Design a protein with these regions (language model features):
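C-lobe/activation-segment region of protein kinase-like
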Residues: 134, 139-230, 235, 260
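Non-Sec secretion/translocation targeting segments of pathogen effectors
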Residues: 1-3, 271-273, 281-309
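Juxta-kinase regulatory segment immediately upstream of eukaryotic protein kinase catalytic domains
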Residues: 1-15
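Conserved structural core of kinase catalytic domains
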Residues: 65-105
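Catalytic-loop of the protein kinase fold
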Residues: 117-133
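Regulatory extensions appended to serine/threonine kinase catalytic cores
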Residues: 234-263, 267-275, 279, 288
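Short C-lobe core helix of eukaryotic-like protein kinase catalytic domains
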Residues: 108-118
């Protein structure tokens, strides 16, 4: 099939196709062996942005299942085709996936998101239901990408950081390691100084625009569980089972960082200041922020001098 070819079908043929899912804005049908057709309903057509949609049609990316070809039904544009992902939602599978396999998949996903930033594609409406686990390739896939936005007004690094923040937020929720989540693995890990400190650095790095990876948290969590129980967990389900057998006590002196809600995950100076205050229980002044920036610059300069030596 030629790239960006318009596929024309009639409603009678469409009604004979297998329905894979229904949403507020569309119905998804199986189309051949390797594709699906997403048919927009009235609500979906109102939200459809033709200019943005045309830009997405020209982009290829391994993690994002982007629109491939326009579809006309009874002579009118009604949707598009995209790759068929043979698998389940990641949140339904993540507990049983081998940790090394999961880590490898996340690293590949991070590289794909890096590549996507070159085209200035921003994630919009990313949610847990749109993150899939491809059984055939052991890879993470993101579907429901038709509302993603191409915006050339931002730098590539800004695009990458914004998308990684969204992606990492979803992964933390599905892994069950987010600060403030229900009792169990998350609560157990955040009472451990090794993990708690690593999580603090991870959050601060994200707020300061540094590249932060959930992979580091998974590896530290596995190490913590091994040290505590003498068992190397193979997956998250084993971690949860081990932790669930213990009575968890929260220390009064444990300084657990407050997680920034998804709707506030914008790297603005105001929100960054707010989170730092929550994590330190100390109100930050402008002078404090300037001092932090100066210390960061000094460390970078020292590192450069050491490398030259």
């Amino acid at each position: 099939m030629a790239e960006n070819e318009i596929i024309k079908i009639n409603s009678e043929k469409l009604n004979r196709m297998q329905v894979l899912g229904r949403g507020a804005c569309s119905v998804v049908y199986k189309y051949g062996d390797n594709q699906v057709i997403k048919v927009l309903n009235e609500s979906g057509m109102k939200l459809h942005n033709e200019e943005q949609f045309e830009q997405l049609l020209r982009i290829n990316n391994d993690i994002c299942v982007l629109p491939q070809n326009k579809v006309e039904i009874d002579g009118k544009f009604q949707g598009y085709t995209m790759e068929f992902v043979d698998g389940q939602q990641l949140q339904e599978k993540i507990g049983k996936i081998d940790l090394d396999t999961l880590i490898s998949a996340i690293k590949k996903a991070e590289q794909d998101i890096r590549n996507l930033a070159q085209d200035k594609v921003f994630f919009q409406d990313l949610n847990q239901g749109g993150i899939m686990w491809d059984e055939k390739s052991d890879r993470i896939k993101i579907i429901d990408t038709d509302f993603f936005e191409v915006n050339q007004d931002f730098e590539e690094e800004e695009c990458f950081n914004a998308n990684m923040t969204s992606f990492n937020t979803m992964l933390e929720m599905e892994l069950g390691i987010m600060s403030g989540q229900a009792k169990g693995l998350a609560e157990y890990l955040h009472t451990n100084p090794q993990f708690s400190n690593a999580y603090r650095e991870y959050i601060l790095g994200s707020l300061m625009g540094k590249e932060s990876s959930v992979v580091d948290l998974i590896q530290i969590a596995r190490e913590v569980i091994e040290n505590e129980f003498g068992v190397i967990p193979q997956n998250l389900a084993e971690m949860r089972e081990l932790v669930g057998e213990q009575e968890i006590e929260i220390s009064d002196v444990t300084d657990t960082p407050t997680f920034l809600p998804p709707d506030q995950q914008v790297g603005t100076p105001i929100l960054g200041k707010q989170v730092l205050e929550e994590m330190s229980d100390t109100q930050l002044t402008d002078e404090t922020e300037n001092e932090m920036a100066s210390q960061e610059l000094e460390l970078q300069q020292q590192s450069s001098v050491e490398q030259e030596r």
